[in-house]
């Protein structure tokens, strides 16, 4: 699980940032959901993290990290 996007955008060129944010907002369900993931009110699934990393890779950004992450442990 992960949340927070400041680190994602720290090395992004100014002309790429609006497009990347817009595509992320669309994927995550709009402005409200984007900011919930950004502020940790919701956690990104591994699938969502992979999608975002692929999106950034399409714009030639490969070394990206989310602000926070944690592993969920399954206790049986």
Q: Where is each model-derived feature located?
A:
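Helix-turn-helix/winged-helix DNA-binding modules
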Residues: 15-16, 26, 44
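The alpha-helix within a helix-turn-helix
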Residues: 21-25, 53-56
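DNA major-groove recognition helix of helix-turn-helix/homeodomain DNA-binding modules
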Residues: 46-64
């Amino acid at each position: 699980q992960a949340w927070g996007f400041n680190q994602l955008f720290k090395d992004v060129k100014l002309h790429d940032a609006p497009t990347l944010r817009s595509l992320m907002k669309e994927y995550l369900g709009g402005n409200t959901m984007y900011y919930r993931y950004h502020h940790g009110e919701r956690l990104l699934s591994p699938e969502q993290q992979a999608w975002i990393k692929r999106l950034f890779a399409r714009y030639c950004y490969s070394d990206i990290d989310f602000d926070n992450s944690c592993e969920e442990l399954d206790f049986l």
